[in-house]
Design a protein with these regions (language model features):
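A glycine/proline-hinged amphipathic helix-loop "lid/cap" segment
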Residues: 1-92, 320-328
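Short strand-loop-helix active-site module centered on a catalytic nucleophile
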Residues: 84, 101, 117, 138-200, ...
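Short beta-strand element of the alpha/beta-hydrolase
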Residues: 96-106
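Short amphipathic alpha-helix adjacent to the substrate-entry channel of hydrolases
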Residues: 111-128
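Hydrolase active-site cap/lid region
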Residues: 178-235
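Short beta-strand/loop motif that positions the catalytic acidic residue
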Residues: 249, 255-257
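Catalytic histidine-centered segment of alpha/beta-hydrolase-like enzymes
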Residues: 289-300
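Catalytic active-site module of serine/aspartate enzymes centered on a nucleophile-bearing elbow/loop
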Residues: 298-328
Length: 328
């Protein structure tokens, strides 16, 4: 039924688990959906701290022991108050200059997720343990990411650096590259943008069409975005990088999402903005995948991770080839 101004009112209907995904993905989708989150009031920092601590604890328990002795971890303090976890997979050559600057999502922990990234990428990872709201709203997290990139540039050439993140980490990855470029820093070799929160105004179509379908994001995240922005305009490119001017420069990028991802539109729109600016950009969409795919439990998740590894290896290898053949 069509409403004024083109709004469509849909009748209540059942959405089955599709037969077009793996059995493992079907099993994940058959689980009860995440309960709707009731965010605290913006002026109640103690309640926000308690909610964040509970989320962090759940993720730490889920990730415990996944990396084991396959990596070594060294913590580094950054100017301004942030920290970097340098994670090196076992057996990596000491002379290997490749570094993946990993920016975790809003609900993740520094070393737990990044250890898996280091193993999958077979490269050294610098994971930014950035300051977060409610105690440190915007631009603290972005400041810490910039400080990490500056520290990394002091040790590695930019063409050996790839920056990546998922969800809020995808937001910060894109925002960091825009800010670094605006401040005259060299661009990294490439960017990995996995289901990025590219538009904090939630204007994209999927924020309506996938409402109730995404198993990980049960509803709007606007309250947490407002907490992070601390009164700043949500449409600013450093908050909503979709609004950045990509014609001024941006590295090649890979973007990933799924058809049930609440941030499907954020990802698709960001990919289109990059392509309009002439930036090489790949877009990979998983059938029926929600925010974060199938939580790492299905073959579809591994396919996406292999695509990311291929993309990173391609861009790191291109640098090696140019160094070996300077006439090219």
């Amino acid at each position: 039924m069509s409403e004024p101004h083109g709004t469509i009112r849909l009748p209540a209907r059942d959405i089955p688990v599709p037969s077009t995904v793996s059995r493992e993905a079907q099993a994940v989708m058959a689980r009860p959906p995440a309960e709707s989150v009731e965010f605290p009031a913006l002026d109640d920092p103690q309640a926000w701290r308690a909610m964040i601590a509970a989320d962090d604890g759940a993720i730490a328990a889920m990730m415990a022991g996944r990396a084991g002795a396959q990596v070594t971890v060294e913590n580094r303090d950054l100017a301004g108050g942030g920290r970097v976890c340098e994670i090196t997979p076992a057996g990596l050559d000491d002379g290997d200059e490749r570094v993946y600057l990993d920016i975790h999502g809003g609900g993740e922990l520094c070393a737990t997720m990044a250890a898996g990234t280091a193993i999958r990428m077979a490269a050294r990872v610098w994971a930014v343990d950035y300051r977060m709201p409610p105690d440190h709203p915007f631009p603290a997290a972005l400041d810490d990411c910039l400080a990490a990139y500056q520290a990394l540039l002091a040790e590695r050439p930019p063409e050996r650096i790839i920056i990546g993140g998922a969800s809020a980490g995808g937001n910060l990855t894109a925002a960091l590259i825009l800010r670094a470029r605006d401040e005259g820093l060299p661009l990294p070799a490439a960017a990995v943008l996995m289901t990025p929160a590219a538009d904090l105004t939630e204007a994209g179509d999927s924020h309506q069409t996938n409402l109730g379908l995404d198993p990980l994001i049960p509803g709007s995240g606007k309250q947490s975005f407002l907490l992070y922005a601390a009164g700043q305009d949500l449409s600013h490119p450093y908050l909503s990088p979709l609004n950045g001017d990509f014609t001024k420069g941006f590295p090649p990028a890979i973007l990933t999402t799924g058809t049930r991802d609440m941030l499907l539109s954020d990802t698709v729109l960001l990919h289109r903005a990059l392509r309009r600016a002439g930036i090489p950009a790949e877009l990979h969409v998983t059938e029926a995948g929600g925010h974060g795919g199938f939580m790492g439990m299905a073959p579809e998740d591994q396919e996406i991770l292999r695509e990311v590894r291929r993309f990173a290896d391609t861009h790191w290898a291109a640098v090696t080839e140019r160094a070996s053949n300077p006439s090219q």
